[in-house]
Amino acid sequence: MKGVVAPSANRFGHVSPTSAAHVSADLGEYLDAHGDLILDGGDCQVGVESTIVLATGSQPVILRPGAVTAADIKRITGVEVSEETTNAPRVSGALDSHYSPTAQVILITAVSQSTFESKAGFLALAQTPTPTGLVRLASPETIEDFAHELYGSLRAGDDLKLKTIYVVPPSGDGLAQAINDRLQRAAF
């Protein structure tokens, strides 16, 4: 059995691109120097990268969570899928530190109990109020919106030269789990 491999259109460890403009910002000089082009098919629909499943053993294992969950796979195929339990990275994006902007990402659970630096960004679901003095990078209404806007928001923080981005991670399973996986790595 052979796997499928495709390169990411960003520099290793950096925030993943979700638009052609992001690819150009990361790789434009390299592409221009080699006469390569960027094919713009519009912004990514989901935002966070795909689910990666290892299907070589008797039970498939999710190596990287994404929009497709273990429950989705079981519902469609009837096959039980487990989640990776080892800390050893086996796939892209599984290092402790990955998807990282230049700004420091700090995960917080409660806005009212936090002290914030000035000139910092903020990302949370829309119903969470923006603390005074912070720059709201996005106001996603749903978990799906959060996933779609996550990387663009982290890149916007870098574009604004923010030193810190405070994030209130969404709670829940499924896509929220994938978002939290990416946020944990960005904050490492």
Language-model region placement:
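Active-site-adjacent structural elements in enzyme catalytic cores
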Residues: 1-188
